[in-house]
Each structure stands twice: as structure tokens, then as C-alpha cells.
Design a protein with these regions (language model features):
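Conserved ABC transporter NBD signature motif
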Residues: 80-92
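Conserved ABC ATPase "signature" region
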Residues: 116, 120, 129-144
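Helix-to-loop junction immediately C-terminal to a conserved catalytic motif
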Residues: 72
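Catalytic Walker B motif of ABC-type/P-loop ATPase nucleotide-binding domains
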Residues: 173-176
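The feature captures the beta-strand-to-loop junction immediately N-terminal to the Walker
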Residues: 57-59
Length: 248
């Protein structure tokens, strides 16, 4: 659990200190991202330990998705620096998985065929932790279902996308609106799967770290050890929570 917290001397900074890890999983120092004259992020500074489970709240355009992209190495900051597990984001991408609005699934393939393909991409890197069949079962999908992903409902596509990113059981999981298009039962099942992910240490024995964005905080709260609210590219509020599920 997080034992203490505080604000650093950096502008707009929220820094979380913990005994979970001697080295932070994520460090952002005065990160800004500009698109022309629009500032998607404004001098955001943040330090998170391995094992943190962070829910990002905020209206559309608040900077949530941009923040995830920068941590994932899919976008670069205009100003400031980013460190993931002590290195540059792209250097650590083998330890990170991202689920965004684009599912990254091939419509003409079944879910199992999709996951077998993604598993083959990691065949020589020893990254695959789950079988494609198990990854699908874990999110409530039948691996034997012959239907193409293109014929799936939005909720089924969302679950198949989650199975894809959990296939390697990454050290850092970044989820952008994972509960969108899910009914309450499917959303609760996803929460349970993510709780299992958080409670299972990596092969190296380190705690897994989660950041997710959502417009449905009531669904995400069971996962959260920290809730951050963004507004106009700045972190404006935080709420720290005690998470018994991390000890399960």
C-alpha cells in the first residue's frame, strides 16, 4: 500500500512515494504537449511506483489520452522528460501494453486467430505469458467461437482487445476507456480480470502497474489506489485509496 504522499516543488506536480519499489515505474518531469497553439498537457510532473493502479478522470480534451500516449512512447512531449522503468518509453515497450479506442484486431480473423497472430510476434522474445486460449477465457470469450471479429458486438471487441494486451502479462498496462461499450456485467468481469492482473507479480517478482482513463469512475474505483483528475492539461486533484484487492 502507499504509505505517504505529497506534492513536489515542481509546477503542477503530484508525486506519490511508496515502499513498493526502490525505483519509480513512471516519472514525468514538467511534461507539456502542444498541438499548434493548443496545449494538450501543461507542465505535468508525476512519479508512480511499481504496483500503482491509477485512474485518470477528466472531460474530453482534458489530456488523459495524450498522457497515456506519451507514457507508451506513442507521442513525444514538446517539453519535459519521461522515464518508464528507468529508461525511455520506447526502450521499455516490451514491458508495456496499450489498449486504446482502436482495438488493433483484424476483422477478417476470429479472436483466437488474432491472438495466435499476436503471440507469434513474441515467439522469439519469451514475452508470451498466456496461451491465446487462456487469454480469451480470462475475459469471458470462447476461444472456439468461429465468428470473425468483424461480426462481434462492440462489447465483445472490447473484451478481445483486452485479451490481446494481457497476452504478455505486461509490467505496465495502459487502458484508454476500457469500459466503453460494455454492459455492467461485462464491465464488472473486466474489473475482476484486471484485479487478477494486478495481484499477480511479474516473472521477476515486481508489482504490475496500471493506468486507465474512464468516464465511468464508479466502475474503476475497485481498481484504484490513486485517482487523478485532469483539467485543461493539468492534474488538478488526487484521491488516494486503500486497495485490499492488491493483496489478494
Amino acid at each position: 500500500m502507499f504509505c505517504t504522499s505529497g506534492r513536489s516543488i515542481l509546477s503542477n506536480s503530484i508525486v506519490i512515494f511508496a515502499t513498493l519499489s526502490s525505483e519509480p515505474a513512471i516519472v514525468l518531469d514538467r511534461v507539456s504537449r502542444l498541438y499548434g497553439n493548443f496545449a494538450a498537457l501543461r507542465e505535468v510532473s508525476l512519479s508512480l511506483p511499481a504496483g500503482a493502479s491509477v485512474v485518470l478522470l477528466g472531460e474530453n480534451g482534458a489530456g488523459k489520452s495524450t498522457l497515456l500516449k506519451i507514457i507508451a512512447g506513442l507521442a513525444t512531449p514538446t517539453y519535459g522528460t519521461v522515464s518508464v522503468f528507468g529508461g525511455k518509453p520506447l526502450e521499455q515497450r516490451h514491458r508495456v501494453a496499450t489498449m486504446s479506442h482502436a482495438t488493433m484486431l483484424y476483422d477478417e480473423l476470429t479472436a483466437l486467430e488474432n491472438l495466435r497472430y499476436f503471440a507469434s510476434l513474441h515467439a522469439d522474445t519469451a514475452l508470451q505469458a498466456l496461451s491465446p486460449e487462456q487469454a480469451l477465457r480470462d475475459v469471458g470469450l470462447d476461444p472456439a467461437l468461429p465468428r470473425r471479429v468483424g461480426d462481434y458486438s462492440q462489447g465483445m471487441r472490447q473484451r478481445a482487445s483486452l485479451a490481446r494486451v494481457l497476452l504478455t502479462e505486461p509490467d505496465l498496462l495502459l487502458l484508454d476507456e476500457p469500459f466503453s461499450n460494455l454492459d455492467r456485467g461485462s464491465a464488472n468481469s473486466m474489473v475482476e480480470r484486471l484485479q487478477k492482473y494486478l495481484a499477480t507479480p511479474s516473472a521477476e517478482g515486481t508489482r504490475r502497474t496500471l493506468l486507465l482513463t474512464t468516464h465511468q469512475p464508479e466502475l474503476a474505483r475497485p481498481l484504484a489506489s490513486l485517482v487523478l483528475t485532469l483539467r485543461e492539461g493539468r492534474i488538478v486533484d488526487r484521491e488516494e485509496l486503500q486497495l485490499a484487492t492488491h493483496n489478494s
